């Protein structure tokens, strides 16, 4: 029997939150704008695109038992990624990234919380 080839990725699977201001940003104040969430993370994004092109993929990452983790899992499965190798950390929050974009489309600031990735160790792999 021929061995089936697949691409495996080890790394981040985040929930991304992008906010784009509708006007010049005012520091230390609430700013009107548009907010959008989507699954992200460089490794996850690459594997998603390969899956959409018909390649077999498997993601090795970590998610928490939370809304973001469930969405990351469901979105990967929806495009055919093998998500069975995900480390589930019930006491951790899933990895997340936030970017604030100014009205011209340039990033003003970004922030990430990827502490959960510390659980991806050589012993786990």
Predicted regions and their residues:
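Short secondary-structure capping/turn micro-motifs that flank functional sites
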Residues: 66-67, 92-93, 117
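Glycine-rich phosphate/adenosyl-contacting loop at the front of the ribokinase-like
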Residues: 1-62, 67-81, 97
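Short secondary-structure boundary/capping elements
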Residues: 38-45, 90, 117-121
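Conserved phosphate-binding/catalytic loop of the ribokinase/pfkB sugar-kinase fold
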Residues: 88, 99-125
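A short, structured active-site edge motif that brings together acidic residues
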Residues: 85-94
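Short glycine-rich, polar/acidic loop-and-turn segments at beta strand-coil junctions
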Residues: 61-65, 87, 102
């Amino acid at each position: 029997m021929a061995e089936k080839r697949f691409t495996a990725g080890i790394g981040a699977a985040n929930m991304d939150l992008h906010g784009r201001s509708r006007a010049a940003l005012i520091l230390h104040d609430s700013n009107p704008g548009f907010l959008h969430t989507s699954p992200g993370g460089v490794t996850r994004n690459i594997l998603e695109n390969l899956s959409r092109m018909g390649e077999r993929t498997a993601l090795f990452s970590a998610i928490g038992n939370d809304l973001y983790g469930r969405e990351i899992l469901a979105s990967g499965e929806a495009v055919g990624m093998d998500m069975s190798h995900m480390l589930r950390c019930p006491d951790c929050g899933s990895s997340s990234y936030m970017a604030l974009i100014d009205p011209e489309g340039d990033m003003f600031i970004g922030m990430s919380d990827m502490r959960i990735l510390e659980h991806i160790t050589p012993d786990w792999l």
